[in-house]
Amino acid sequence: MDVRRRSEKPAYPTKEFAAGEKPLKPHKQQQEQDNSLLIASDALPLPLYLTNGLFFTMFFSVMYYLLSRWREKIRNSTPLHVVTFSELVAIASLIASVIYLLGFFGIGFVQSFVSRDNNDECWDEEDENDEQFLLEEDSRRGPATTLGCTAVPPPPALQIVPMVPPQPSKVAAMSEKPAPLVTPAASEEDEEIIKSVVQGKMPSYSLESKLGDCKRAASIRKEALQRITGKSLEGLPLEGFDYESILGQCCEMPIGYVQIPVGIAGPLLLDGREYSVPMATTEGCLVASTNRGCKAIYASGGATSVLLRDGMTRAPCVRFGTAKRAAELKFFVEDPVKFETLAAVFNQSSRFARLQRIQCAIAGKNLYMRFVCSTGDAMGMNMVSKGVQNVLDYLQNEYPDMDVIGISGNFCSDKKPAAVNWIEGRGKSVVCEAIITEEVVKKVLKTEVAALVELNMLKNLTGSAMAGALGGFNAHASNIVSAVYIATGQDPAQNIESSHCITMMEAVNDGKDLHVSVTMPSIEVGTVGGGTQLASQSACLNLLGVKGANREVPGSNARLLATIVAGSVLAGELSLMSAISAGQLVKSHMKYNRSTKDVTKASS
């Protein structure tokens, strides 16, 4: 089959084609006529510098004349709508000059963009139609009379060569950019959008709203990012995720998702019930170690937990002119009668929010009010913030000189290690304990009770005190908290205060058995809202039996999840401390937490 070689596309569309080239098809003839755009200056025979100067002079002189007349009328108390003939002429001249200037500069400016976009679209349409024309022409034996064109033989100098797929340029090969991540059916349209994003014509954040397809928007954004940075994102998966589920609530401008393996530790026997604990982590040996701790707890009869407090906090900062006025508001807020009024205002924000107390602190003329409230099965940051805003609006009427500096004054304290959380608690305060028998300590944990007690005192208590730890009197509570948080859709940043933990170990029953406990004053979890509604995280919550909100006892699912977190931390602490006590830490990590391939490379 003979295939014609298409001549190279000129830099800009032209009105005529050189002799020997293929004739224009009817739709291209109309397209060439449309490309002959008029500009505003074509209607005037005078040189542009004369007409421009004339109308610029007319505009400014007439404007000055009208403003002067306007000022005189104001001084003489003359009605502005009474105009003379000269003023009518001036107004007409002003309108004429404005029309000319807008027509010349405004239309020309717009046409410069419109014509450029139209030309680009014309060339894209021409490329597509040319390829289709060549394929249709090759499939016919007779001349192409059905297209309304006269068959013109190719020029003698034009060689007949087979068409081959375009090869990637050397620059593209060096940058190792993958092919555009678009579907064949929409490749041309998506390619134009990708170019617009790369060139900065279309904001990347607006793709979802303009396309109406979240997955397609993520695909286009990912390809545009590869072209902008020159870095390959081939290993970042795009398929297999519901991007509609994160729109407007979990993540902005997505380009894919990160895969984190999820392991199962357990069964964890806690308060008479068994739980298989999902842990999302990339640290080898972590799940295995926690699983061993669960085994030791199970073999010893299980663990028990107690919920001490349940209240999310938010602490706005307000300022007064004097410290005395700040103290007056402090006394007002702490008054039991006034508190009932503030609680009623606060509780209007949600049917689950219930204000429990307000803790105040003064720094000069600044007052920090730490609101504590229950939030049902939600983690509750948005809920408590909304309630605090209602109270601030109410107090603004009572204290008009109160200046609200910010709805969060860091006396909360969120996503930061703070003594106020360690002492007063934030979220769920839980203590979890278990008695591990001597037999289990020796057979499962491979250590001795006395060795564990001594190590805990010197490491978790004395060592942490020497380091000036704030809530870090434990071995690795953060490891377990982070893994469970990621698996169940919690806020990973709140791992900071949620990992506040003190681990205690004592010998009981005449020194034969081990009493171990973890006290965690600020576990911040929820079973509704945020990442808990995503498919994978929702499945992990369902595995624990705490998916969604509990309709019968609001808040019970979130409280149960907090106790499961504490029980998992107890298992992790027990296993790691045993490994350190028995001298097995390095051996186990070299076996489970380090690649054999990496060890070989390091030794060679």
UniProtKB/Swiss-Prot annotation:
Belongs to the HMG-CoA reductase family. Glycans are attached at residues 347, 460, 593. It is a multi-pass membrane protein. Residues 111-189 are annotated as: Linker. GO terms for biological process: coenzyme A metabolic process; isoprenoid biosynthetic process; sterol biosynthetic process. This is 3-hydroxy-3-methylglutaryl-coenzyme A reductase. GO terms for molecular function: hydroxymethylglutaryl-CoA reductase (NADPH) activity. Induction: In leaves, by wounding, elicitation, bacterial or fungal infection. It comes from the Eukaryota. The active site is at 283 (charge relay system), 415 (charge relay system), 491 (charge relay system), 589 (proton donor). The chain crosses the membrane at residues 40-62, 90-110. Residues 1-31 are annotated as: Disordered. Its main location: endoplasmic reticulum. It is found in: Endoplasmic reticulum membrane. PANTHER family: 3-HYDROXY-3-METHYLGLUTARYL-COENZYME A REDUCTASE. Keywords: Endoplasmic reticulum, Glycoprotein, Isoprene biosynthesis, Membrane, NADP, Oxidoreductase, Transmembrane, Transmembrane helix. Its EC number is 1.1.1.34. InterPro entries: HMG_CoA_Rdtase, HMG_CoA_Rdtase_cat_sf, HMG_CoA_Rdtase_CS, HMG_CoA_Rdtase_eu_arc, HMG_CoA_Rdtase_N, HMG_CoA_Rdtase_NAD(P)-bd_sf, HMG_CoA_Rdtase_sub-bd_dom_sf.
